[in-house]
Amino acid sequence: THRMAREIREELEKQNFHVVELRMCELRDSDLRDELELADLVLVGTSTINRDAPPQAWHAMSLFSLVTPKAKIAAAFGSFGWSGEAVKLVEERLKGLRFKMPVPGLTLRFSPTDDNLRECREFAGQVAAQVVGTE
């Protein structure tokens, strides 16, 4: 998932987006909340562990309800080994919080191949187009 995030971030930066990458396991709640308030776009990357997103992802997402999602676009992506449910679960949570979700989540099995990294760049381009379309 980290390689996916790096590829997505680099593609967004090529398109002149200011990207703040936050690692949920290393973040204070107040810092996450502050960054969410400033963001036009929220991308959540998560792996699937035991058919779910890890606890750190759910804790971070619990803070999303403190943010007004008006006009905020969100999307999810992640890697999995066997089942891959985490991205869909995260998408459901984001939709429930009323984030706009115009681009389907991206899931990749195991470590990304060169073709998968291309998919990550395409995903970033699709999300970027949605943000640009709302400005």
PLM region descriptions:
Residues 6-25, 32-135:
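FMN-binding flavodoxin-like domain, especially the glycine-rich phosphate-binding loop
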